[in-house]
Amino acid sequence: KTSIIFSIKHEPGSLHRIIENFHNYNVNLTKIESRPTKTNTWEYNFYVDFEGHAKNSRIAEMLEKINHETLFMKILGSYPSAKLN
């Protein structure tokens, strides 16, 4: 499982272009949450959790594409999924 944060331009289709990467790489999103930035009106930070580890070559390639399509992107963590009993 990996968690990232990113910010995108406030324009039509910008979030779709990011989410489309997950579809194209067949990666399952487990959580997406938006929070307004403190700096610009109508600009949001998106927190995303998804299945897969950042060191996996396919995931790393997807994250590189996302990084180029965002104002900024940061990997918050990449860790094994836990199973609850």
Briefly describe each language-model feature range:
Residues 1-85:
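A conserved regulatory-domain signal marking ACT and ACT-like small-molecule sensing domains
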